[in-house]
A protein has these predicted regions:
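N-terminal, positively charged nucleic-acid-binding surface of large information/translation enzymes
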Residues: 1-175
């Protein structure tokens, strides 16, 4: 039996380590997985070497790294699909945002039965056509399956990075 192997190697811990050591996250991640000598001259064994020494039969051709563009391009693609969709309660499925725009152009939003923000003002087809492109985009954001929103960010000026919620205790960085 050949076992696949994967590394969840994308995100704040990898970025934080790179900031602390003054190295690019791609370099530190690759070094941690493959091993070698880092910029400080330290020998890094690497996860792959350690796993090979255990004696398991890993199929390295099936290795997955979440930091690899071949992996995360699929995640990005999924979010684009979600962003370009809205949920039509009448058909009980997600549909292309283009169908919603067509409905707005023909009838406004009076007959739209969608999962959306609660505070959407009714508008007619004439209203829709008179809205600026920016106004139309703001309205569409209220219907999209994924959306942009203002939110609080835990910025740490001392570290020069955003901190995850679990790194904040009583409003102060744990680091």
């Amino acid at each position: 039996v050949l076992h696949p192997q994967g590394y969840d190697s994308f995100g704040l811990p990898a970025e934080q380590y790179a900031i602390q050591t003054g190295q690019h996250p791609a370099d530190t991640t690759r070094m941690n997985i493959e091993g070698g000598v880092d910029k400080s001259g330290n020998t890094i064994q690497g996860y792959r070497n350690q796993l090979d020494r255990i004696g398991f039969s890993f199929d390295w051709s099936r290795e997955v790294r979440t930091s690899n563009p071949d992996y995360y391009k699929h995640t990005q693609w999924i979010f684009i699909q979600l962003f370009e969709s809205w949920y039509n309660k009448n058909s009980d499925k997600a549909e292309s945002i283009c169908t919603l725009i067509q409905e707005f152009e023909k009838n406004g939003n009076a007959k739209v039965n969608a999962v959306c923000d609660d505070n959407i003002a009714p508008f007619s087809a004439e209203d829709w056509k008179s809205f600026s492109s920016e106004q139309q985009q703001k309205i569409l954001l209220q219907y999209r399956l994924t959306y942009l929103a203002e939110t609080e960010v835990n910025w740490c000026a001392a570290l020069g990075t955003v901190l995850a919620n679990d790194e904040i205790v009583n409003g102060v960085s744990e680091r």
